[in-house]
Each structure stands twice: as structure tokens, then as C-alpha cells.
């Protein structure tokens, strides 16, 4: 595969995998799958806000803000290709998760959440997309830290 297209393949591969996994788990949740354990429960909640239900006062208008942010990020990444080439998998994961949550907003009126961590403390209910967004941000930060360290080592 040509080097110039490899990053696009990685981006869309990560995008599709994260989107499909998140929607599959959400479909199981909507079909009634429930599970309880000492640490984590699989339940159902419809989040009309963003993280920790913030901005829920925007109600149905939040989906348009969400859509605008995703479109702006897509345009920026494909216009400024260096960032996309460097972090293609992470941005694919992030945008696949974001589009999956956006689809929920248009279809269900909010984001379908299902995981409830309750060992030691009660954490907000979250979904696969939320986890993937956090992992993608961590990947970008780790790559940037190591890139900076390599650059600093070369300067010594």
C-alpha cells in the first residue's frame, strides 16, 4: 500500500471498528441485555447532555452543536494532514466514537449509555464510545510526549 494512503486506511479502519463496536453494544443494551457484578453493571441510560450530563439544558439543539464540532474536526484534519498522518488511528477512534454518539442523538434523542462502575465510588454511566474517546486522547498525548522526548534527545 502506498505510504500516502496508509494513514487514510488506518484512520477509516479505526473509525469503522469503533463505530460498529459501539453501535453493536448499544443495540444489545436497547434489546434488553443487562448484567450486574461487584464492580460493573450493564444497564441502560439515555444521556441528553454530554459528559456527566453537562449541557443537557440545550436539549435537542445539542445534536447540532455536536454535528458542527465533528464537521469542523473532519475538515481541519483533512486540510491539515500532518496531524492526521501522525495520529490517524487515534483520530479515527475519536471521530468514529463521536459519530456513533451523534447518531444516537438523532435517533434516540440522546446518547445510549450502559456501563456503570460502582466499586469504591459511583462513576457516571458511560458507553464504548466514551472509552474510545478517552483512549484516543491518551494515545495522542503519549505519542506527542515521546515525539518531544526524541526531539530533545537529538538536540543533546
From Swiss-Prot:
PROSITE patterns for the chain: SPASE_II (PS00855)
Membrane-crossing segments per the record: 5-25, 64-84, 89-109, 122-142
Compartment(s) where it occurs, according to its Swiss-Prot or TrEMBL record: Cell inner membrane
InterPro entries to which the protein is assigned, alphabetical: Peptidase_A8 (IPR001872)
Source organism, top-level taxon: Bacteria
Keyword Protease: yes
Main location: membrane
GO molecular function: aspartic-type endopeptidase activity
Active site positions, chain numbering: 113, 130
Pfam families: Peptidase_A8
Example GO BP: proteolysis
E.C. numbers: 3.4.23.36
Cellular component per GO, a single term: plasma membrane
Pathway linked to the protein: Protein modification; lipoprotein biosynthesis (signal peptide cleavage)
Topology versus the membrane: Multi-pass membrane protein
Protein function: This protein specifically catalyzes the removal of signal peptides from prolipoproteins.
Protein family: Belongs to the peptidase A8 family.
Protein name: Lipoprotein signal peptidase
Species this chain originates from: Campylobacter jejuni subsp. jejuni serotype O:23/36 (strain 81-176)
Top-level taxonomy: Bacteria, Pseudomonadati, Campylobacterota, Epsilonproteobacteria, Campylobacterales
Gene (name only): lspA
Amino acid at each position: 500500500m502506498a505510504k500516502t494512503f496508509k494513514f487514510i486506511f488506518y484512520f477509516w479502519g479505526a473509525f469503522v471498528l469503533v463505530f460498529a463496536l459501539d453501535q453493536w453494544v448499544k443495540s444489545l443494551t436497547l434489546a434488553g441485555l443487562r448484567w450486574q457484578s461487584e464492580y460493573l453493571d450493564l444497564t441502560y441510560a439515555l444521556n441528553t447532555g454530554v459528559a456527566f450530563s453537562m449541557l443537557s439544558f440545550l436539549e435537542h439543539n445539542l445534536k447540532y452543536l455536536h454535528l458542527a464540532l465533528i464537521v469542523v474536526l473532519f475538515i481541519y484534519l483533512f486540510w491539515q494532514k500532518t496531524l492526521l498522518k501522525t495520529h490517524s488511528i487515534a483520530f479515527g477512534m475519536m471521530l468514529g466514537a463521536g459519530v456513533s454518539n451523534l447518531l444516537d442523538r438523532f435517533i434516540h434523542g440522546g446518547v445510549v449509555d450502559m456501563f456503570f462502575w460502582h466499586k469504591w465510588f459511583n462513576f457516571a454511566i458511560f458507553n464504548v464510545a466514551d472509552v474510545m474517546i478517552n483512549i484516543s486522547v491518551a494515545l495522542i498525548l503519549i505519542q506527542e510526549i515521546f515525539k518531544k522526548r526524541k526531539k530533545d534527545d537529538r538536540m543533546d
